[in-house]
């Protein structure tokens, strides 16, 4: 499959938010099965139940609420996907009602793109600061890199030369946090660096840390700071 990743894009002119991956994708039949047949059974009730309270409770982004929570902020959602299987790509469109449209797509590369057509009362989801906040809050340690725009970095290519500024991908998350690595591979400075990543506004270093790496009678990994 190769290196997997996700990219998030904002198109303010079109008022759309794009989430793109290069995963295994879906066939048209899989879209019908997993997006329509399964999800529609509880989608209408879910949307009606949380329509008024979603902003106050911060319900967007909570685990397990599913794909259809996107209609809380979007008037229309599109899925353009191509499976790793040798089958045509599919383009699914829905406005949140039980009606949907699915047709073939010209997409050639494997993966899925979800396009949210952001509603008028949810324009803040077209702001970079808002999306950055959400990505950091809910996807900070996802196992695959998440790109959101670009950023400028300063490098010094050779000794004695002037610093040079380059544009690189802005990777929001840390796919390999400290707790996923064996303690033998980490130094004290690595733990302190990870602590600063977790708590950027905490200026004092922790007194000490405990790296949990248990595999019996259950699996448990983590880092405790004190």
Regions found by a protein language model. Give the residues of each.
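GHKL (Bergerat-fold) ATPase N-terminal catalytic module, capturing the glycine-rich phosphate-binding loop
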Residues: 1-125, 133, 140, 153
């Amino acid at each position: 499959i190769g290196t997997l990743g996700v990219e998030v894009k904002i198109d303010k002119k079109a008022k759309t938010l794009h989430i793109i991956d290069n995963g295994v994708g879906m066939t048209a039949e899989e879209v019908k099965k997993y997006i329509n047949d399964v999800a529609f059974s509880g989608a209408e009730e879910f949307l009606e139940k949380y329509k008024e309270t979603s902003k106050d409770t911060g319900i967007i982004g909570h685990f397990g609420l599913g794909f259809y929570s996107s209609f809380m902020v979007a008037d229309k959602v599109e899925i353009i996907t191509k499976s790793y299987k040798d089958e045509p790509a599919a383009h699914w469109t829905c406005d949140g009602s039980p009606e949907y449209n699915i047709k073939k797509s010209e997409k050639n590369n494997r993966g899925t793109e979800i396009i949210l057509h952001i509603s008028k009362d949810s324009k803040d989801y077209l702001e970079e600061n808002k999306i950055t906040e959400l990505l950091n809050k809910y996807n900070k340690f996802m196992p695959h890199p998440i790109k959101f725009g670009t950023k400028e970095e300063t490098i010094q290519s050779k000794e004695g030369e002037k610093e040079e500024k380059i544009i690189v991908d802005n990777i929001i998350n840390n796919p390999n946090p400290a707790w996923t690595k064996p303690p033998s591979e980490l130094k004290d400075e690595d733990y302190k660096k990870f602590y600063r990543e977790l708590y950027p506004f905490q200026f004092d270093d922790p007194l000490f840390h405990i790296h949990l790496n248990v595999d019996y009678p259950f699996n448990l990994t983590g880092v405790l700071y004190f």
